[in-house]
Amino acid sequence: MVKLRLKRCGRKQRAVYRIVAIDGRSRREGRDLRKVGFYDPINNQTHLNVPAILYFLAKGAQPTGTVHDISQKAGVFTEVSLNQTKFY
């Protein structure tokens, strides 16, 4: 199963996260299928590739809780009916 989740980057004590589509069985730093955005919690910056996120959601990808919250704040799910997506 494909998941949309965070991948840690940056330096020590200064984490920046990439939002990636990745196989659910692989580890956090494993090889990703595609980068779909980034999140900087210190500066509170977010950049999302909305068409790529919608593509993976349409193919059945499951976002993690944090990625779901970030996407919801950015308004990604206003474009998709919530009846079409399942979040576990």
UniProtKB/Swiss-Prot annotation:
One function term, GO molecular function aspect: structural constituent of ribosome
Keywords: Chloroplast, Plastid, Ribonucleoprotein, Ribosomal protein
Recorded coiled-coil stretches: none
Listed GO CC annotations: chloroplast; ribonucleoprotein complex; ribosome
Main subcellular localisation: plastid
InterPro entries reported for this sequence: Ribosomal_bS16, Ribosomal_bS16_CS, Ribosomal_bS16_dom_sf
Places the protein is found: Plastid, Chloroplast
GO biological process terms, semicolon-separated: translation
SUPFAM superfamilies tied to this protein: Ribosomal protein S16
One Pfam family linked to the record: Ribosomal_S16
Similarity section: Belongs to the bacterial ribosomal protein bS16 family.
The protein's name in its UniProt record: Small ribosomal subunit protein bS16c
Taxonomic classification: Eukaryota, Viridiplantae, Streptophyta, Embryophyta, Tracheophyta
